[in-house]
Amino acid sequence: MKNRFSIALALVMALVMAFASATLADADATAEFDPDAHIAALAGSYTELFKTIAAPEMDDKWLEKCTAIVGEESAEAASEMLRTACTAEIFGQDAIDAYTQDPDSARFDCYFQGGIVTFVFDGNKVSGLDADGNEVFAHEYYYVQDIPDVIACHVYKTDDADAGEFTYLCLSDDTPAETYHIEFRYGDDLDALGQYYEGKYAYWLAAGILSDADDKMIDDCIQLFVDENLASEEAA
């Protein structure tokens, strides 16, 4: 059988875009957006998504779900592609340089940056903890604008002068109740945050899942990722 699952640049980019199910698609939806309700819907503690759903003990889940869509012969390649497309460990200029030299190796870094291991959302207050549980930052954020193009996100900002790389918080429409995970970016340069493939945040999109996610939420999240990225494939 023809192997349809080489990790080409265009496909990897499509994978990341497809996982964000909401896209700020039309003006009416944007007009109805309630920024306070949205950030409130994210209440909870989050760990890195792909360290959970792409852990070795999840291999069988991925394989089973991929087999159901692309067939047994292509399932392993599809599973490997999906699990690695968002687990790069470089972003920004390092990623730009690497992927310019080898476009077929392009992937997204979907991990937390800035020494953060856990994000905590509590209404408009967002904080980040390091590996020892120490608080790295804690600020209150207020909605300022949408970025409807390229990354499609809602931008929140803190007025705290010492926020540094945590000044802006760009949230996708994802919520744990609807898509079992969240996607977001953060930084001090709003123009750079609005670009996926250029600037200091190139090839980076943080993704989180509730720290206390149960087996069903994890399973549903994997199913969503597989369905949205392999739906157009046909098992031979």
Give residue ranges: language-model regions.
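Polar/charged side chains located within well-ordered beta-strands of beta-rich proteins
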Residues: 17, 46, 181-183
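Bacterial N-terminal signal peptides
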Residues: 10-19
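Sec-dependent signal peptide cleavage junction
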Residues: 18-31
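A glycine-anchored, Pro-Gly-centered beta-turn/N-cap motif
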Residues: 40-45
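Short, solvent-exposed loop/hinge segments that bridge or flank secondary-structure elements
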Residues: 36, 47-124, 165-175
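Extreme N-terminus of proteins, especially the signal/transit-peptide cleavage junction
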Residues: 31-37
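Calycin-type beta-barrel ligand-binding domains and close structural analogs
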Residues: 100-236
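Bacterial N-terminal signal peptides that target proteins for export
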Residues: 1-9
